[in-house]
């Protein structure tokens, strides 16, 4: 059932569906994907329903969505979005390796988080800011988002041994990974590749 619902939510990206039908569907079956949640928020807003802002904020913080939906949602929510909402969205976009949307999101992140996000965005785009001699925020070695993006970039560019060393020598994490599935999948991918080479 979950797979069918996910496919139905993905179909919303390709088809024009009336807001009342979208809202009725998601009222009965809560969204399983962030693009679905974003479409639900827009449908609720079009119908003038009070929960549109709450659902919209959750979708904004949840990460990637269709570019048109992203623009519509931002236009609708701009007055109520807080700086931490923008930082949460940027973190989710970087976990999803959504480089193009993350580049747009940089305009809205807090100054305190900007350097770390820029470093991670470079990694998502396949560039290693440290190798280019750019200064790195010192607190990143304990940040799961940075470690995920860096290990992934190293592994996908053929530097599995460096990725394994990074993950093996890291200090304890300062917070839980935003996306535990991606975190575990990357740890396993690095371990398997490193094991295959030894």
Q: Can you say where each PLM-predicted feature lies in the sequence?
A:
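Alpha-helical solenoid repeat scaffolds
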Residues: 1-198
């Amino acid at each position: 059932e979950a797979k069918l619902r996910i496919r139905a939510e993905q179909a919303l990206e390709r088809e024009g569906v009336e807001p009342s039908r979208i809202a009725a569907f998601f009222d009965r079956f809560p969204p399983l994907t962030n693009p679905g949640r974003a479409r639900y928020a827009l449908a609720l807003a079009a119908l003038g329903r009070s929960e549109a802002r709450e659902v919209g904020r959750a979708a904004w913080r949840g990460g990637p969505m269709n570019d048109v939906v992203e623009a519509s949602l931002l236009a609708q929510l701009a007055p109520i979005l807080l700086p931490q909402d923008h930082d949460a969205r940027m973190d989710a976009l970087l976990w999803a390796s959504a480089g193009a949307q993350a580049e747009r999101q940089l305009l809205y992140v807090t100054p305190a988080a900007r350097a770390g996000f820029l470093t991670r965005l470079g990694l998502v785009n396949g560039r290693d800011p440290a190798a280019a001699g750019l200064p790195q925020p010192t607190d990143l070695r304990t940040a799961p988002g940075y470690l995920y993006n860096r290990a992934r970039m190293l592994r996908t560019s053929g530097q599995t041994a460096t990725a394994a060393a990074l993950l093996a020598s890291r200090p304890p994490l300062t917070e839980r990974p935003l996306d535990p599935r991606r975190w575990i999948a990357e740890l396993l991918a690095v371990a398997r590749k490193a094991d295959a080479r030894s």
